[in-house]
Amino acid sequence: MKRKLKMDNLNINFINDDEHPIPSQDLLLKCLQLVADKHHISHAEVNLNIVSNDEIQQINKQFRNKDKPTNIISFEFEKPQGLPDDIANDFLGDIVIAPAVLENEAKEQNKEINDHWQHIFIHGLLHLLGYDHQDDQEAEVMENLEIQLLAQLGIANPYIEQENQNGR
C-alpha cells in the first residue's frame, strides 16, 4: 500500500506493502510539522517505508554492518548532480521503520505504542536533518531536542526510565 499524506507543504509518502500496523498517519504528520517548524522548514517531503523485522535486519546489515533488526534507519537525501535546488531542497530522505521492533520496545519499556512511534519517527527525522548520536555530546543535543518536541505533543521524556536503569 502506498499513500501520500499531505499537510500544507509537508508530505509523507507511506510505503507499507505488507500492510503492517501503524499508528494514525495524522500523528506522524504532526511530528513532521513540529520538526519542520523547529527548523524553519516550510516545504518537506519524506518517504516512510514500513517493513518486517527480516527486511530491516537486511538493511541494517547492508548499510550499518549490524546483523540484527533495529527500530529505525534513516537515509538522508543526497542531491544528485543537476537536480534543481527547488526540488532537491524539499526532499529530506527515507526512513525505514520495523513496527514489530517498536511494539516489542514499547512493551519492554512500558511505553504507549503511539508515543513510542512518535518518538522514533522524530528521531529519524532529526537524523535526516543531520543530527546524530555518535558521541555523548551529540547524543545529548539530539535527545534534548527530542524531549522538547515530544513535550509539545504531551509525551513524557522517553529517556527517564532508561537513565534510571543505566544509572545516569
From Swiss-Prot:
Cofactor remark from the record: Binds 1 zinc ion.
GO molecular function: metalloendopeptidase activity; RNA endonuclease activity; zinc ion binding
Name of the coding gene: ybeY
Pfam families reported in the protein's UniProt record: YbeY
Cofactor(s) needed by this chain: Zn(2+)
Subcellular location: Cytoplasm
Organism field: Francisella tularensis subsp. holarctica (strain LVS)
SUPFAM superfamilies in alphabetical order: Metalloproteases ('zincins'), catalytic domain
Lineage: Bacteria, Pseudomonadati, Pseudomonadota, Gammaproteobacteria, Thiotrichales
InterPro entries per UniProt: MetalPrtase_cat_dom_sf_prd (IPR023091), YbeY (IPR002036), YbeY_CS (IPR020549)
Keywords (A to Z) from UniProt: Cytoplasm, Endonuclease, Hydrolase, Metal-binding, Nuclease, Ribosome biogenesis, rRNA processing, Zinc
Record flagged with keyword Acyltransferase: no
Function: Single strand-specific metallo-endoribonuclease involved in late-stage 70S ribosome quality control and in maturation of the 3' terminus of the 16S rRNA.
Residue ranges the record marks as coiled coil: none
Protein name: Endoribonuclease YbeY
PANTHER family registered for this protein in UniProt: ENDORIBONUCLEASE YBEY, CHLOROPLASTIC
The keyword ATP-binding is assigned to this record: no
UniProt record similarity statement: Belongs to the endoribonuclease YbeY family.
Binding, Zn(2+): 123, 127, 133
